[in-house]
Regions:
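Signature for HUH/AEP ssDNA processing cores
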Residues: 1-113, 120-132, 136
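Flexible helix-coil linker/hinge segments at domain or subdomain boundaries
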Residues: 138-172
């Protein structure tokens, strides 16, 4: 926001600021005229290119589907002044993924002080099942190396097993 100087994310609605949009009467989540804009290849390209210094090209993703399934699990690691940094925790986590034949992709966080480990599924999985997989990988990684305390582990996306009614879940 140019007014507050803070970054924020919100779904892009095709009806925002049109005559169908009545922000005085409805929150976006409750709006009967809510119609999300579809992502385009140009949106993806601009996001990956990352040239907008104000971050307007950044895309967020709501991971949880309406039927409580997800197409991916994202594990968030942030450097919280842990002795060894987040990198060792990430490497221990992906070492388990590798040994269990779980494909993954590592992405450095926008801040540069952390990373996301992405696990993509061939078909939608129940969020509860995806989160159990993440917990199993995390537990095994901790068991393999007692020196790693995983202080940098922040959370999984999706954050919850079920989608709150009328909600979108958590954004990554």
């Amino acid at each position: 926001s140019k007014t507050s100087g803070k970054a924020g994310y919100q779904p892009v609605c095709q009806n925002e600021w049109t005559p169908l949009c009545d922000k005085r009467k409805y929150k976006c989540a409750d709006c009967p005229n809510r119609q999300f804009s579809p992502l385009t290849y140009n949106d993806y390209y601009r996001h990956l290119e990352g040239k907008d210094s104000d971050g307007r090209d950044v895309i967020g993703l709501y991971v949880l589907n309406e039927d409580n399934t997800c197409h991916l699990l994202c594990t968030d690691f942030d450097d919280k002044n842990c002795e060894h940094g987040y990198q060792d925790d990430v490497l221990a986590f992906v070492d388990v993924c590798r040994s269990w034949n779980v494909p993954y992709s590592i992405e450095r966080s926008r801040s540069g002080n952390g990373a996301h480990v992405w696990i993509f599924f061939d078909s939608p999985e129940l969020a509860v099942k995806a989160r159990k997989l993440g917990n199993a990988i995390l537990t095994e990684a901790m068991n393999r190396d007692g020196k790693i305390g995983f202080k940098s582990y922040d959370r999984f996306f999706p954050n919850q097993d079920t989608l709150p009614e009328g909600g979108l879940g958590n954004l990554v």
